[in-house]
A protein has these predicted regions:
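Conserved GNAT acetyl-CoA-binding A-motif
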Residues: 97-111
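Conserved active-site alpha-helix within GNAT-family acetyltransferase domains
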Residues: 87, 110-129, 133-136
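A short beta-loop-alpha structural element at the N-terminal edge
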Residues: 1-10, 14, 18
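Conserved acetyl-CoA pyrophosphate-binding loop and the N-cap/start of the following alpha-helix
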Residues: 53, 80, 84-92
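Conserved acetyl-CoA binding element of GNAT-fold acetyltransferases
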Residues: 66-79
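Conserved GNAT-fold acetyl-CoA-binding loop/helix
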Residues: 13-39
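Conserved beta-hairpin
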Residues: 47-61, 66
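A short helix-loop-beta-strand connector motif used in the catalytic cores of GNAT acetyltransferases and
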Residues: 34-51, 70
Length: 189
């Protein structure tokens, strides 16, 4: 499972991100980090958990979290961008941080730095002013967000006619259920 997630992340990195970095050191750092055997060992040791998003058994996104609440490996296939998959994966790891790890705040390094705008839109804040270099010329932005108990969805307005129809239907159901109970119990209405 981890090996599949690693292969997926590497392919997305090569397709969409590798060209964003200017130095070979950045590529080497990524390649070393994504060593499938090392990450498998981390998962077995409880240091890392990785979640996947699937579309009809096709892996379309991954996101990992360390046991310290650091989000890593958020990758969504370009064909699945702007469908809420990254947001759902982030929600899932934030819930995991709160419920399983008992961590109140999670962190992520937005890298490449331009991805910080995306993380801001989904509730993260910059941990420091500006960005930092990761030892090379390429920038990243450390960010944090609160972990969450559950996904909070914006309630939708229910049209008045729909609400009335549901209310009338429920009232009829209760009335007739009571009537049937009374008849079955031998009571006269």
């Amino acid at each position: 499972e981890i090996k599949g997630a690693c292969a997926f992340a590497v392919s997305i990195y090569n397709i969409a991100i590798r060209g964003c970095f200017r130095t070979q050191e950045s590529h080497r750092y990524f390649d070393e980090y994504m060593d499938a055997d090392r990450l498998t060992d981390e998962e077995r040791a409880g240091v890392l958990v990785v979640f996947g998003a699937f579309d009809s058994n096709v892996l379309c996104g991954v996101c990992g979290m360390t046991n310290e609440g650091h989000i890593t490996m958020l990758y969504v296939h370009p064909q699945y961008l702007r469908r809420g998959i990254g947001k759902k994966l982030l929600e899932r790891v934030r819930i995991y941080a709160r419920m399983q790890l008992k961590i109140m705040q999670v962190s992520v390094n937005a890298m490449p730095a331009y991805t910080a705008d995306y993380f801001r839109r989904v509730g993260f804040k910059s941990a420091y002013q500006g960005g930092f270099c990761n030892g090379q010329d390429d920038m990243y932005v450390p960010m944090t967000a609160k972990s969450i108990y559950q996904v909070e969805y914006t309630p939708r307005h229910i049209a008045d006619k729909t609400f009335i129809a549901i209310s009338v239907g429920f009232t009829c159901l209760v009335f007739f259920s009571g009537l049937i109970y009374a008849v079955c119990a031998g009571l006269t209405p």
